[in-house]
């Protein structure tokens, strides 16, 4: 018996913390060079905060280290602005809808002051890919918000005033000329929709300091097949000494966000345009449609000009991945410099991005921003849904594309497992990328959660292993976006190095079969799994979407060759009502499994027959 007298006080253990290096992994939503200071460069990410590049150490520095779980708003930046005259100043807007801020720094983000915004903001909502939407000019801050239209502050964010844009609340971009007299604003067109499915006008111009706006020529709506909403929304804007250029995109199959969803972050765009404008007598006028190809099913988004060269990207191109174009005649003609794996050389310096792990293709997608360096016309940066990339060789034509992610870690870690022994030390399951099995703590993982062809599974919700044989692991991934892997239950016998997909438990019930049909579609949750302590029984709460129903829990003793359905009863032995559960095994007793009932009054089920039946127990 342990008492105070015989207790032994152990010496404190000193822990050292670091991160397992993955590299990139998430959506970089915008790139911001300072126009005159060659050592000031920022990016924003959808869920990973703002980063500043350290040119001396050649790595990205994370600026949200002080963020807490109680107030995570800075991890969701929506827009960045800089002071053209003072490279030390940094402004960015951020929010999680509950807390919404304009953040101001006088030392490049080392110290940040938050001031509350009068509108809802979220850096991981639809529209995050467009911009820019924050401007600092002549002591004023201008913000094109997602929910309150255009607002501005003359006292560094202490107070804000609204500017009416024909009732439009969802702004996609704002831009002003060097003198701050000419303004252009893009919007979703929702407020002026004639019928609820066709956007109203989406592009406006002001020449009187934002006192009034007039419509600026924009593409007419096109009723694309399979499109949910019709009409083109401005995505990005750039200018040079001769022209202003604006990219547009038209929604595809929008599954969320309604007409407020207008950018690549809905995952589908039906069409795109690139328009060129000129300034006549202080007024912006339409000059020419310079769209490279009207017949490609995609949008156009990233665009940048330095006066000599114009760069442009497609976004959400359905077949072959996004393309990058260059023009040296203001868009009169275009040259492709990247199309899938063609036209450019690639240096895949991050292992999981290699084509052989991505169906033999290019992992680049969601190019919504591209920026030429103001200080090196041979170099440009572009964003993707899996990190930041650099282009070099633009002047010579020997174009090299490579990830530029050193220091950027923007992955969603859904669970992590340590192995007591085995060839790998850490099993890390991740949103979007699936998972990695790390042999050691100091090097990147080559590739892990993939099928026999190297095609990656994505977004595992959980995994399980036994203490007796940690080489034997089960996991529940989604099938990837290309359809080259299908979701379900996967099994590894070599500690996560290789995987096989187990047969589906079809025929147990129509309810389960419907869920299995859904799981075979791209990017659908497959469920929750657990394995008995002796490694001989695998449990699976089948999902096929959100939640893990207790009516869809099954088990196998022969790695999926045959399946049986688990039975759930309440504390009286009657059939339990349907609700979601998560299954867990006892790590020592092979007969014991537990199920946590995810409902308003949380419940606990226990199985003493290896998961065949679960009975609810009373808990206090």
Regions found by a protein language model. Name each.
Residues 1-620:
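Extracellular glycan-interacting surfaces
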